[in-house]
Amino acid sequence: MTGQAALERSVSSHRLSVRSRLEGEAERAESAISRTDGDDDTCSELQRVTALELPSAEMLEAFTQRRPLARLVNLVLSLREWAHKSLVETEQRPDSFLERFRGPQAANDQSAAPADAPKKTFKERWEGFVVSQSDDIYYYWLFFIALASLYNWIMLVARACFDQLQDENFFLWVGLDYLCDVIYILDTCIRLRTGYLEQGLLVKDLAKLRDNYIRTLQFKLDFLSILPTELLFFVTGYVPQLRFNRLLRFSRMFEFFDRTETRTNYPNAFRICNLILYILVIIHWNACIYYAISKALGLSSDTWVYSGQNKTLSFCYVYCFYWSTLTLTTIGEMPPPVKDEEYVFVVFDFLVGVLIFATIVGNVGSMIANMNATRAEFQTRIDAIKHYMHFRKVNRTLETRVIKWFDYLWTNKKTVDEQEVLKNLPDKLRAEIAINVHLDTLKKVRIFQDCEAGLLVELVLKLRPQVYSPGDYICRKGDIGKEMYIIKEGQLAVVADDGVTQFALLTAGGCFGEISILNIQGSKMGNRRTANIRSIGYSDLFCLSKDDLMEAVAEYPDAQKVLEERGREILRKQGLLDESVAAGGLGVIDTEEKVERLDASLDILQTRFARLLGEFTSTQRRLKQRITALERQLCHTGLGLLSDNEAEGEHAGVPTHTHADIHAQPETHTRTSAETNSEEET
């Protein structure tokens, strides 16, 4: 007994020591975690992992000497480590690359609310509750209301026509009916609190929302759909026909279909399913009406109505549905009608069947055309290339390479023109989509890691995807450099002039070609390519032209310096930089750019000269018109005109100046001076 007590005391003391050691390690780990959380965002995840390393290797080695106790301790340590990891790493760290591009985002209402704010009661939350039509909860609610509406559209008419269906499951129908009524009432309450956009902002004023909903036609239909027509059951009994007002809620079902078509990734397939559903509902209604007419005229009363030989519900409905399908699809092969009522119903069915057939042909044809539009356009391009190569008698090897390149595009779904698809979006959304799509690639590019967000937006929007086949040269040494490239997928090899010797391997995320388009002063190669780069397999690249890069970098001098310095480093390593000349940066302009600028300046000068010439011609025309008008005015007043006697005197050489002539001479002189001045101005 004494030995057993001593053993128990030793085990308990050992457990206490183990517990104290574990608690000490846990406290040190928690303090390390708190210090790690207090650092800035630049701390690495490795620090978090090392802070959670509980316990040390020596401690575990000491525990493993006692196997039962070691297993227990290992279990405790594993549980503690798992608990710490789950507590520390529950929140995912934001991506700094995306945060720098997107900028500060507005916090949601819960995070923006102060911590010491009083908790709102249910009544206060309900008074401020407003549903936005763009929320997911609104879409999910549309799903339930669409189910309730579809249930009424299918089952009410069937229960009204087939008495056996109504009687066999009476309590089930009562429960489902009142469940749909509850959903309808809740939907009306939600519609009273459904916000709408006004000047781009969500309206949350409950009084305004209520007035806006009440003034619509939909409110009147919704109100009629929830009228308690079941009160008439006390007079007529539980007749499903009294619940036909529930069918007025059909607009919510159509709204759900429209939103689903917008959200789904397979809109064409959904449209086909939606069309099939409409057709089945129409056939179902027609089958029920056919049975109701047969029952009203008398079962087996003639050859056209339902015979009623088999009284089972399933056979009865299947036969009516079969008759309705043959009639609406205009197949016929059914007994002809006998009575006038039967003829009217069959004629109406034929008209509806023609409309259904036309709808099916039109919709299915357009859907199939839309589904195959991309393939048809792609096949047209292939056929045009094949025809051209056959017409120009291109060799078989090159033709095979072209066909394989097209096959690669189609197999890897690279036939979509991104610029054409995204052209209707604003630049901000286009840039954000491009960032999310090409994020992994852009993160690996060193040139983009420190650039400003505005430059990143411009560069991403200017990138053009290109696909190269195995063995294609992206650029050759000595070529004029007009583009730089960023590798998205694939591998490229820097090869010698023979095309076989491989110097380096470029993988996804690398960029090249920027040296030849930067126009760095002191570069011995100028704007020429400095290496041969060849595609090993199929490679997806992003191309950025020289004009686009210069246009974007011109407004960001810091990024311009980074590009310049990186280009100098590469040239210095390759021995292609003349340090004595390398004093400038990207300001060097080659001859081609100078000629382009001179052409632009010449166009501007020609435009200005044409404008000045037009102004001169217009001014000259106005002056001539003024001189002509002045001459006509002088002639009209008689100034400067000679009478017959004065004319004879002038011919005889006798001066015949009168007093009026003396007074007229200064005026004539004045007119001559005015004309002289006008001519001088001209």
From Swiss-Prot:
GO biological-process terms attached to the record: sensory perception of smell
Species, as recorded: Ictalurus punctatus (Channel catfish)
Localization of this protein: Membrane
Coiled-coil portions: none
Stretch list, region Disordered: 1-41, 649-682
UniProt-recorded name of the protein: Cyclic nucleotide-gated cation channel
Topological domains, Extracellular: 158-169, 240-272, 333-343
Record's keyword terms, sorted: cAMP, cAMP-binding, cGMP, cGMP-binding, Ion channel, Ion transport, Ligand-gated ion channel, Membrane, Nucleotide-binding, Olfaction, Sensory transduction, Transmembrane, Transmembrane helix, Transport
Function recorded in the entry: This cyclic nucleotide-gated channel is activated equally well by both cAMP and cGMP.
Chief place where the protein resides: membrane
